Every structure is written in C-alpha cells, then in structure tokens.
C-alpha cells in the first residue's frame, strides 16, 4: 500500500482546422511549403509572429483530415504519501497547480515528458489569448483541464 502505480489512456480532442484559426487551410499549405523550402522570408510575418504562424500552419496541415482524437497515456505512482503524475508533453503551470491542489497528499510531483512528447498543454485562457503554444498545440482548448481531471482520478486510484 505504500507503493503503487496506475496508468490510463485518455482520448484527447485535437485542434483540427477551424474558423477561429488566423489562417485558412489553403494559406497554411502555402506557408508550410515556403517554410519547408527555406523561404520563410516570403511569409509576411517577422520574428516570433513568423514562428507562431509557421507552427500554426504546420498544425493545420497535420490535422486537416483528422484524427479528431489522439490517445494519450497518463501515469501515476506513489511512494507513501507522495504522488507523481506522468504527463507526455509540456503542461502549463496551471496543470501542476491543479494536480497539487488534490487533497490527501503530502506532496504531488507532476512529471512532464513522461513516455513521450506530444507538445504543449495550454490552459483554457491561453487559447483565448492566442499565443504561440496554444496556436501550435495539437489539442483543443480544455486539454490542460482534462489532464488535471484525469490526473486526479489516477491519484485517487493509485
């Protein structure tokens, strides 16, 4: 009872192209082709905005035809009253705060890049702000909150 391990697979909704994207699918393909040809200078953006637009274009092209969901493995293990929650990507700080708020643990240690790297897991408000991580993320808004919810379920089971 002092040591435990659980794992689950969660189907995470992907951020497929939509009307909220700053660029349409046709433009995304154009920017992707220019970028892959080493012609970023022909894309009408500079500095970090160029990086953001290219990342968004690559995401739009990648998910143009789906899939609607990506299976993601979450893990949790405990040593006594210390819990570790494994997340296969780069969660925003709010994910850590949400997991650490779970009651009954002396310490909760979120561990990123566990069993893979599926990208960024921005909080809902980051999607509303529209920054690089949210615009390039493979996942729909709400992914971070879903990870918190599923991570807490694992912590209850472990």
Which residue stretches match the model-derived regions?
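Non-catalytic substrate/cofactor recognition surfaces at enzyme active-site rims
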Residues: 1-158
């Amino acid at each position: 009872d002092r040591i435990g391990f659980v794992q689950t697979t969660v189907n995470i909704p992907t951020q497929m192209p939509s009307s909220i994207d700053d660029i349409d699918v046709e433009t995304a393909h154009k920017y992707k082709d220019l970028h892959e040809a080493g012609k970023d200078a022909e894309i009408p953006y500079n500095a970090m905005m160029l990086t953001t637009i290219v990342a968004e274009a690559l995401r739009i092209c990648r998910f143009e035809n789906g899939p609607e969901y990506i299976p993601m493995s979450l893990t949790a293990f405990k040593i006594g009253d210390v819990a570790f929650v494994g997340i296969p990507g780069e969660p925003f700080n709010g994910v850590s705060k949400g997991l650490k708020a779970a009651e009954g643990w002396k310490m909760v240690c979120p561990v990123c890049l566990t069993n893979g790297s599926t990208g960024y897991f921005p909080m809902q408000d980051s999607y509303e702000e529209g920054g690089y991580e949210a615009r390039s993320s493979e996942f729909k808004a709400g992914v971070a909150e879903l990870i918190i919810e599923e991570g807490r379920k694992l912590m209850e089971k472990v």
